């Protein structure tokens, strides 16, 4: 029984000592965190710019935009036509009661 009580007492003291050490530890400075964040963003931006400069990536992006333009142009024309028809329908509704 004494061994059990001594073990519980020892575990309690160790956990309290650990909590005290954690409380006394220095918290990371916010300025350092912000500067590290901006440094990381800057490094990422530099790496991205180096990757964008490659001719393969530029050619791939150009072909992607051309293909997208080919696919979207008919859809945009169709949507524009339907919008004009839709608005003209409401314009006709507005003029009908006045003529009756």
From Swiss-Prot:
Tissue specificity: Plasma.
Record localization: Secreted
Positions of post-translational Methionine sulfoxide modification: 49
GO biological process terms on file: cholesterol homeostasis; cholesterol transport; lipoprotein metabolic process; peptidyl-methionine modification; positive regulation of interleukin-8 production; positive regulation of phagocytosis; protein oxidation; protein stabilization
One example GO MF annotation: high-density lipoprotein particle binding
Cellular component aspect of the GO annotation: spherical high-density lipoprotein particle
Extent of the signal sequence: 1-18
Key words, A-Z: Cleavage on pair of basic residues, Disulfide bond, HDL, Lipid transport, Oxidation, Phosphoprotein, Secreted, Signal, Transport
UniProt subunit comment: Homodimer; disulfide-linked. Interacts with NAXE and NDRG1.
Function statement: May stabilize HDL (high density lipoprotein) structure by its association with lipids, and affect the HDL metabolism.
Protein name, as recorded: Apolipoprotein A-II
Organism listed in the record: Pan troglodytes (Chimpanzee)
Gene (UniProt): APOA2
């Amino acid at each position: 029984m004494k061994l059990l009580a001594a073990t519980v007492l020892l575990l309690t003291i160790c956990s309290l000592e650990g909590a005290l050490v954690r409380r006394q530890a220095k918290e990371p400075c916010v300025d350092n965190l912000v500067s590290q964040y901006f440094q990381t963003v800057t490094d990422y931006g530099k790496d991205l710019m180096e990757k964008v400069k490659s001719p393969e990536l530029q050619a791939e992006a150009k072909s992607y935009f051309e293909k997208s333009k080919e696919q979207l142009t008919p859809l945009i024309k169709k949507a524009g036509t339907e919008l004009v028809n839709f608005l003209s329908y409401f314009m006709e509704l507005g003029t009908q009661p006045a003529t009756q």
